[in-house]
Structures are given as C-alpha cells and as structure tokens.
Swiss-Prot record:
Molecular functions (GO terms): ATP binding; protein serine/threonine kinase activity
Pfam families documented for this protein: Pkinase
Domain Protein kinase: 1-211
Name listed for the protein in its UniProt record: Probable inactive serine/threonine-protein kinase DDB_G0280559
Description of its domains: The protein kinase domain is predicted to be catalytically inactive.
Amino acid sequence: MVLRYSYVFKQPVNYSNIELNEIKNIKDEKVRQNSIFISYLNGLYNSLNVLEMVSISGSLPSKLIQSIFKIILSNYDYNAIGKHFKTESILIGESLFKWPSPRIQQFDQFFFQDYLYSSPENYKGSLVGVNEYSMVWTLGIILYQCLTGELPFPTYPKIVNFITSSSQNVEIPPQFYKPENSLLIQLITCCLFKNPAQRISWNEIVNHSFFKN
C-alpha cells in the first residue's frame, strides 16, 4: 500500500487503489484530470518498475521501451492526460538511498533534492512547483535511461555544466543512433530541450509516432 499526500485531495490518498472506473466517476473536472495523471505515473512505478529492468539488463531495446509505454498509455484516457493538470505536490523522483525505481513523491520534500530528474529551470529558480514542462523533462530522462542504461547527468557538476553551457538540448551517445531507435531518440530530444517552452507537450507525447508504430 502506497500512501502519498496530495494537495488535490487535501488528505492522504492510497493511489495504488485508485481505479480508472472510479476516476471517471469523479465530478470535479480538475480533480479527475489530476487523478488520471497521478494514476498514470503510479502505473509507471508500481506496475512496471522500468528502471529496475534497466539496472538488470543495462539498457532496453527500443521496441521493448515502446511496448512498455504503450501499455501504460493504453490504460488511460489519452484526451485527459495533460489537460488542465496542476500537480504541485507530486513528481517522479528517485530516492538515492533505497529505491532504484522512480516514485511519486511529495514536492516540498523531494523535488529540489532530486538532482537526477529535476529540470534545469528549477536550478535557476525560474519556476516554482511541478508543472507540465518539468514533468516532460522527467519523462525524457527516464526514456533516456531506458535507451542508454545511463543518466544523462549522473552527477550534480554535470548538470551545472549543462545549465551554464550554450547547449540547448541533451545529446544522446552516437552508438544509439540506429534506425530502430530514430523515433524514440526524436521523442527524447523533444522532451529534453533546455528551454521549457520548446519541449513537447503531454498531448503531443501520447500522440507521438513512437507510440503509433
């Protein structure tokens, strides 16, 4: 049983017991949209443990990554993901001491400490809270890790170097530029632009060609 606090519900919620049919019956539109997004992220962590698979195998084939994320996306209403959501209290994070997989965490306790998955703008203090831009960045980091078996910025100095450099997007190692990886690399690149306004939106992600093949 996973208990997390959410400002959406103003009380502890057992996200693992939130079923899609229950979500569809929620009358408050904003709460319903947030619930779907929370369940989407929770499914990534609790059902698939993607990064545990990466840690065991080193990296994952593009087709397997596609299949994994298709399964997650197919369980939820595409039109609801990313609409009007404001999830200031949650994020995908990684405990550096206990868990190898991404988890939904309380924003105020974990976000700024989680340098592995935090978006560049949060180091500059230009954005407060978790928004669509930072969530897209985090998803891009997870996809990058699935493809390469490594984090793009495994240490804090490397993140700082990227933030202060003239580079506008994260570079993927050349050995992964293969025809079967082309759409995945395109998606990762669109998620990991330094400028948040240039990043792909959630609606564009779920409709991306990578998930359509």
